[in-house]
Curated annotation (Swiss-Prot):
Any Pfam family: NAD_binding_3
The keyword Transcription regulation is assigned to this record: no
BP-aspect Gene Ontology terms: NAD biosynthetic process
Organism: Bordetella bronchiseptica (strain ATCC BAA-588 / NCTC 13252 / RB50) (Alcaligenes bronchisepticus)
Keywords from the UniProt entry: NAD, NADP, Oxidoreductase, Pyridine nucleotide biosynthesis
SUPFAM superfamilies (alphabetical): Glyceraldehyde-3-phosphate dehydrogenase-like, C-terminal domain (SSF55347), NAD(P)-binding Rossmann-fold domains (SSF51735)
General function of this protein: Specifically catalyzes the NAD or NADP-dependent dehydrogenation of L-aspartate to iminoaspartate.
Coiled coil: none
Highest taxon of source: Bacteria
Protein name: L-aspartate dehydrogenase 3
Amino acid sequence: MSSREELGVAVAGLGAIGKALANRLARNEVAGCRLSAVSGRDPGRTADFIASLPRPVPAVPLHELPRHADIVVECAPAAVLPQIVEPVLDAGKKVIVLSVGALLEFPELFRKAGSSDGQILVPTGALLGLDAVTAAAEGRIESVKMVSRKPPIGFKGAPILAERNLDIDGLTEPLLLYSGSARAAARGFPANLNVAVALSLAGIGPDETQLEVWADPGVVRNTHTIEVVSDAALLRMTIENIPSENPKTGRITAQSVMAMLRKMSAPVRVGT
C-alpha cells in the first residue's frame, strides 16, 4: 500500500472548466487527489452544484481556500487572480493558474512567489510541445511565433474589439485582429490567449514572442500554429482544440490540469 498522503484540491471558480474539474475530482478520477473545497461567485448556484456532487464539500470565500487544500486550482475571471494566488502563496502552498495571461498584469505575483514557500504552476493546457520549448530554452532560442485562429464567437467581449472598433459579427472571411507581442496581446484578449502567454513564459518571454490573432469563420476549432527556432531544434506545431462549453477555451484545458494533478501524486512521472 502506498504511503503517499492524499492531496486536497480546491477549485476557485465554477465556470465550465471549474465544474468539469470539480466533478472529476469528486468522483475520485485522480488517484491520490480529492476535491476538498470550491468557491463560486453565486452562492445559490454554488450550493446547487455542490448538491450534484457524489459527496459534499465546503463552499468558501476565495481567500479561505488555502485552509482547506494543499493545491488550489484557479478557474476564475482574470481580474480576481490576485485574490486567489496571494493567499495561497502566503500559506506556502501551490496554485495552478489557468488565467496565465493575467500573470503579466500582476507582476507582483511573480515576486511574491519568489519570496514565499508557495509555488505558481502553469499547466500545459492547449500547448502541444511545451516540454520541448522549455528544453530549448535551456540553450538559445532565436525566435518564437504563434498564429491563433478561432471562430468569431470565441472573441466575443474581448477588450481589443472595442478599443479598435472591430466588428466580427457576420464575418465571411478571416479578419486579422492583432499582430505583435504576446504581452500586449494578453491585455487585448484576457480570456483568449493564455496559451500564448504560457508559450512565452516557457520560451523567450512575452516581449519577444510574436503573435498573430485571427477571427476566422472558416474554422470550427481553436487552432494554434507555432514555430520555435533554436540552437537545439526547429519546432513546428499545429494544435486544433475542441472548444468546451466556454467557446473562448478548449476542452483539453481541464484535462491538462487533471494530468498535472495526476503527475503530482503519481509514483512515476513522465515529462519535464
